Amino acid sequence: MDKEKFYITTPIYYPSGNPHIGHCYTTVACDSIARFRRMQGYDVLFLTGTDEHGLKIEQKAAEKGVTPKAYVDEIVAIFKKLWSYMNISYDRYIRTTDDYHIETVQKIFKELYDRGYIYKGEYKGKYCTPCESFWTESQLVDGKCPECGRAVTEAAEEAYFFKLSPFADRIEKLLLETDYLQPKSRAVELVNNFIKPGLEDLCVSRTSFTWGIPVTFDPGHVVYVWVDALSNYISALGYLNDKYDDFDRYWPADVHMVAKDIMRFHAIIWPAMLMALDLPLPKHLAVHGWITFNGQKMSKSIGNVVDPLVLGERYGADAIRYHILREMALGADSSFSNEIMINRINADLANDLGNLVSRTVAMAEKYFGGTLPECREADEELDASLIDPALELRDKVATYMDQTQLNNALAEIFKVISRANKYIDETTPWILGKDESRKARLASVLYNLLEVIRITTTLLSCFMPTSMPKAWAQIGATENLITYENAAKFGVLPANVTVHKGDALFPRIDTDKEIDELNALIKAQMEKAIAAQQPKAEVPGVAQIAFDDFSKIELRVAEITDCEPIKRAKKLLKLQVNDGDGSRQIVSGIAPWYKPEDLIGKKVVIVANLKPAKLCGEMSNGMLLAGDVGDDDVQVLFVDGMPAGTQIR
């Protein structure tokens, strides 16, 4: 009988720079799910890749004096090197510059045009080149791009548009009445912010740059990002191309995993495209948060980007895989810090798991020469307190994996590992070993521990595929015993199993020394980044002002007491702040970078004497200070150590 299929995808990553820990999380999470499904017996297809077209790529290539293809080739090689190092078991790697993908996109575009869902029009508005986006006057924030805060220019461009409105009702039902979107809490947000106000037709072509897929029937146009990028999930299966022929086998996808910044495109635009093509919809869209550094969004421009290769070289790929998966709950942001990472590695991997394996193997060697005798003596109640949770573990883990809650799956495994360590303390094998008449009981205790190690490391092998085979070698578990079926059985190891002492699975890290060294690395990164951002001695086009003019600006610390999105403006947040003299309302274009609930209680610097202005129908009485740190990244200046009302001089 044919195996049941399972198709899982990462987003295709934009190779405008080297991969970082955020890319790593999504890919490691998908890899762990793919490995778990393979262990369950599924026919798995795991897809990842890179999204290689667009104006930004064209511009970056020009800056380096190379062709766009040569530019992306270099960065794609770095992505693949990282995935190899992190032991990512992808089955296919798609590039949007692949000929077969280009063929599929061109045919999809023509099919949507022929069906009347794509039409030709003109896009007018304020254009932001770095964001490759048009904006209406009302969407601008202080006259600038609401995405990145940069200056915009008046522009009009002939373009093709995709009709979204015909699919609004079906998409609303998809989000609210099915379990397509995980976590489900995101569904209401999408419906209220995007569907209820009315879905606007989507611009799907450009004439202002050439690095893209040409529209076959109108070669002056190239296909714009989302029709190109989203189609990868089906072009990689051979849809409308001859590269592969398993579209009917694997589609629809079982899981698309993406970060929250591209949730809208996968939750609204992608289903609409599939509906227009009369294709089945994916089963699940799993949306995760961002990994921040010490609570601050990572940015290459300020030098706080965490390089997974650097960490992996210090602690091993499996330790990094475990840490990022254990720390992030689906849908929530996770703050990365050197202290948390090292403490997690020491506590869970070195102490709990590593010590369990090393102590058990060492005692088997010490008291039985490495081979357990077949005699047994049970303590039914005490043994059951270890064996029963171990037997229930596999199905608990499977439930969490079905829900894409990898952190909870790992937590369940480590509960059983913790129970095994406690079992050692309760059974006192070092005392049993001194009494010849208790050797049968000692053999039972050690065998129970070895079986728990087998079960837990079998399940952990999906998350840490390099280290767990080392544990199996130490406990005498041959490869044929490491199966999904055996993970719910007790008594699989031979009664007279032979153990083999080996190196520590995860050596303990000197916390203070490592933190000092890592902090020094980050500091050096930040100093280098800051130096690179320093302005030249003379900045053409920027007028100098007198000190008297500058002194008219009143900068004051204010505490954010409430914050909410503005439904009519996707980029704006409405903040209530206490400036020391009372409450005032400020509207700020920071929604792409901050969630409202994360800002409440934060202290910020505001321009307190700015003339009030109305933005999208809301009065804004001031402006908060934020920095444009590059890479389409804006960061608010937080001053949590100062009381509200403090004057900034």
Question: For the regions a protein language model found, what residue spans apply to each?
Answer:
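Intrinsic disorder at enzyme termini
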Residues: 471-549
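Phosphate-backbone binding interfaces of nucleic-acid-interacting proteins
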Residues: 531-649
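N-terminal catalytic cores of NTP/NDP-binding nucleotidyl/phosphoryl-transfer enzymes
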Residues: 2-75, 94-110, 114, 131, ...
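Cys/His-rich short segments
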Residues: 115-168, 172
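Structured secondary-structure scaffolds
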Residues: 1-48, 100-104, 148, 154-366, ...
